[in-house]
């Protein structure tokens, strides 16, 4: 699957959100957009620019390119309920996102690598597709030979239990987790406004 290969730190500074642990540290030192005029940019931002910015936040946070993101939006529209809520719920069900939420990786990019490299099992079967949608009751775990990866142990040691959401039950010792439920929108604490994205695509 194609993925973004540019500077995540620069994108983080432009959007004002941390897209990786490294970017988070960088933003603490330079909390403004990159470039010569990063600290002095002012002026009224157009409605379109605001909508586009929120879309970029969602795409980069979940590591999704435009074509796939638009497909998620179309599916969200076709479902019952609030389109924006449906969109967020689908993104939260992605396997790479769930692996990240479990604390098995400090970033979604790292979680995506764990999936694509074949380290993860879902209900006992290997799944190497990051966009695989996890369902309530699914068990996510590492393959036997992957359970002692140093990077995973390091991530679990650093990730506080408070970061693991209530809709996932994690067994750190055995490198396992159960996806208990699809989260409600208000439970997902991410710095974006999906309603502006819906307005953008509705035009």
From Swiss-Prot:
SMART domains in the record: Ribosomal_S4 (SM01390), S4 (SM00363)
Annotated Gene Ontology cellular component terms: small ribosomal subunit
SUPFAM superfamilies named in the record: Alpha-L RNA-binding motif
Keywords on record: Ribonucleoprotein, Ribosomal protein, RNA-binding, rRNA-binding
InterPro entries: Ribosomal_uS4, Ribosomal_uS4_bac-type, Ribosomal_uS4_CS, Ribosomal_uS4_N, S4_RNA-bd, S4_RNA-bd_sf
GO BP: any one term: translation
PROSITE patterns: RIBOSOMAL_S4 (PS00632), S4 (PS50889)
Keyword RNA-binding set for record: yes
Gene Ontology MF term list: rRNA binding; structural constituent of ribosome
Domain S4 RNA-binding: 93-154
Keyword RNA-binding: yes
A UniProt-annotated Pfam family: S4
Family: Belongs to the universal ribosomal protein uS4 family.
Function: One of the primary rRNA binding proteins, it binds directly to 16S rRNA where it nucleates assembly of the body of the 30S subunit.
NCBIfam families linked: PRK05327.1, rpsD_bact
Subunit structure, interactors included: Part of the 30S ribosomal subunit. Contacts protein S5. The interaction surface between S4 and S5 is involved in control of translational fidelity.
PANTHER family: 30S 40S RIBOSOMAL PROTEIN, SMALL RIBOSOMAL SUBUNIT PROTEIN US4M
Name of this protein: Small ribosomal subunit protein uS4
Organism per entry: Chlorobaculum tepidum (strain ATCC 49652 / DSM 12025 / NBRC 103806 / TLS)
């Amino acid at each position: 699957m194609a993925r973004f290969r540019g500077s995540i730190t620069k994108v983080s500074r432009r959007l004002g959100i941390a897209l990786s642990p490294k970017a988070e540290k960088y933003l603490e030192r330079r909390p403004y957009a990159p470039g010569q005029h990063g600290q002095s940019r002012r002026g009224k931002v157009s409605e379109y620019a605001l909508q586009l910015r929120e879309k970029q936040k969602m795409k980069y946070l979940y590591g999704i390119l435009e074509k796939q993101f638009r497909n998620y939006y179309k599916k969200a529209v076709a479902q019952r309920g609030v389109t924006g809520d449906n969109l967020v719920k689908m993104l939260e069900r992605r396997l790479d996102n769930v692996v990240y939420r479990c604390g098995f990786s400090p970033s979604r990019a790292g979680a995506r690598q764990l999936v694509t490299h074949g380290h993860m099992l879902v209900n006992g079967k290997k799944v190497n597709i990051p966009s695989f949608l996890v369902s309530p009751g699914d068990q996510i775990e590492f393959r036997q030979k992957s359970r002692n990866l140093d990077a995973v142990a390091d991530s679990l040691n650093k990730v506080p239990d408070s970061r693991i959401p209530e809709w996932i039950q994690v067994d750190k010792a055995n490198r396992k987790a159960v996806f208990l439920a699809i989260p409600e929108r208000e439970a997902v604490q991410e710095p974006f406004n999906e309603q502006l994205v819906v307005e953008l695509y509705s035009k």
